[in-house]
Amino acid sequence: MRSYSELFRTREFTPLFLSACLRTAASTVSGLALATLVYRATQSPLLTALSMFGPSLAQVVGATTMLSAADRLPPRATVSGIAFLFGLGTVAMAIPGLPVWVIFALLLLLGLVQSFGGGVQWGLLNEILAKEGYLLGRSVFNMMSGLAQITGYAAGGVLVALLSPRVTLLLAAGLYLASALTARLGLTPRVPRASGRPSIARTWRTNARLFSSPERRTLYLLLWVPNGLVVGCESLYVSYAPSRAGVLFAFAAFGMFLGDVTTGRLLTPRVRARLGIPFLLLLAAPYLLFVLRPGIGVAAACVTVASVGFGSSLIQQERLVALIPDDLSGHALGLHTAGMLTMQGVSAALAGGVAQLASPATAMTVMAAASIAVTLTLAPSLRRGSAASPARQHREVPAPNGSQSQVNSP
């Protein structure tokens, strides 16, 4: 599969894509509205950052207890059901006078539900397109996410200014419900990829199996930690520029879009393989300039250039998919998503804490420096893994009896 037109001619790709697009727009609009609401109520950079990214902390609970559900639930019902629950939760958060602690309780509950939702969605995408089409399909989803964020943050900023954060939350809830309806009507019923009931024991066994490969382990860490630390920088946009945060979010999304187009469509596989680490360094380096507290114009340029580096995720994902056993696609990709979102939540909390003690600009600089340090630490391990297994597809040693996940190959 080599062209975008082939993707959209593939049955079920379009409804899955449209549902994800609506859900991303809803998340973007609601995140900005909720952060504005919390900042106005508390004047706290920490709570503001946590309102946008803190729910991701629930992902660590889901990744260690519920992730086996990613291959054991019917995909259509799960994708549409999660979007519906997010719509209801967003309506609840728009209730006037709702205490901040109740808002955070709802956010954490939704984060727990989403902990296996990513695995269901990406496992379904891998099933629809098969491995040879996964990178191109994922790049389209990433580009869509960038465009939806550009539109969502720009529209969200206007809506919050013209209407109110609570009205904006209600509009976002409508987008979530539209996403649920699109998935319900557009996807066909499929049996779960695995038999048996989800369980904590299955989740732990499969996580251990995936982490048994040093190369997979390094790839997971590269997908989780450097990117997550930079998301900690992004979580401080509202605190750094309260009235212009939408501008920074929109330019960051535009940079991410450019990075995904370049990585997924323009680079050859050979060149792409060499740019994983440089892109991760690019992702963090421009944020070091925030130590100078630049104005909104320079800040927007910095976040645009930095966000091109998010193209590194596609490069690492391509390598990870080649190393995933066929019978673990949903769980393995869900582990990637859950770990990524968990690290985003942890980083938002860390960045918010540093900003409370110092300033948002200082915190952004510290998080960027930490991201660069982690990338440089992990890079040698990835190069050693590549030298030991150059350009190969994964050959999995069968798991011992009792520990093999009972998953049917897609």
Regions from the PLM with identified roles:
Residues 1-13, 188-221, 396-403:
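Juxtamembrane intracellular "pre-TM" segments in multi-pass secondary transporters
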Residues 32-41, 93-96, 151-171, 239-244, ...:
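Transmembrane alpha-helix termini and helix-breaking/packing motifs in multi-pass membrane transporters
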Residues 51, 55-71, 76-85, 92, ...:
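C-terminal transmembrane bundle of multi-pass solute transporters/carriers
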Residues 127, 169, 173-198, 379-392:
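Helix-loop junctions on the cytosolic side of multi-pass membrane transporters
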Residues 21, 89, 100-116, 297-311:
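Hydrophobic core of transmembrane alpha-helices in multi-pass small-molecule transporters
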Residues 45-46, 131-141, 326-336:
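Loop-to-transmembrane helix entry/capping segments in MFS-fold secondary transporters
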Residues 21, 25, 29-33, 163-170, ...:
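A single, central transmembrane helix in multi-pass transporters
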Residues 107-147, 153:
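Cytoplasmic helix-loop-helix junction between adjacent transmembrane helices
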